[in-house]
Amino acid sequence: MIPRSGWVLLAGLGACGGSTPAPHAAPTPVSRVAETASAAEVDKVWEQATKAVRRGKWGDVIKHLDRALLEFPPGDPRVTQAHMWEGEAQFALGNNLQAAREFRKASDDTPNDPLAPEALLRVADAYADLWRRPELDPSYGQTALATYQELLNRYPGTTAAKRAQMRIDDLQERFAYKEYKAALYYMRLKAYDSAILYLKDLVATYPRSAVAPDALIRLVQAYRTLGYKEDVQETCGYIRRFHSTAPGVGKACPKGAETS
């Protein structure tokens, strides 16, 4: 069973010292440890977290990092890495929203840290992973797209930005496919005017998408069904100019038949 958050593990960690906790003050042992931990104790917790990361023991990673983050002194350089690792642990366990929060802390609390661009990339990745089926509500996909674009603006030229651009291209393909599926739905209902709206928006917004040529062909079919001869002629001219080798072009737009 995937745990809902690392805080449950943190509560268990606070009670692992061997003594019985006070019945009405469960958080207190953790707070006292955070206030009295020596540098050596903090280093030990960090070492435990590091080993857990290497072994892929994500529950242990969260447990040790939650404690370490409480005990780190202000300005400790390990804080950003701790949030990154906790984000990866939460992501691995399927807790995408918690992962996004941890990655966001790493990118926003220490924006000049070398890990900040990668952290922002992972924020977007966590949201993108929640939008796995294009036909579903695209809210998470839109959040992912906005975050990838934020990365391009904040950290242009970085390796993370280059990877973000690739992910943007993939998301745009998925958005285009979503529009295409909606258009086909209206085509099946013979609601051609509605289908045309989706197809035109797809072609205008995602002209380089893989489904754009087929969307244009479907647009011609809808125009022809409705008797929009000028639109057929104009769209066929566009198809021949930019997608002349796409499958189905010859059948959809035979030369000399645009106005038939």
Question: PLM features: residue spans?
Answer:
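Acidic, polar-rich low-complexity tracts and alpha-helical solenoid repeat scaffolds
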Residues: 2, 16-260
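Sec-dependent bacterial lipoprotein signal peptides
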Residues: 1-14
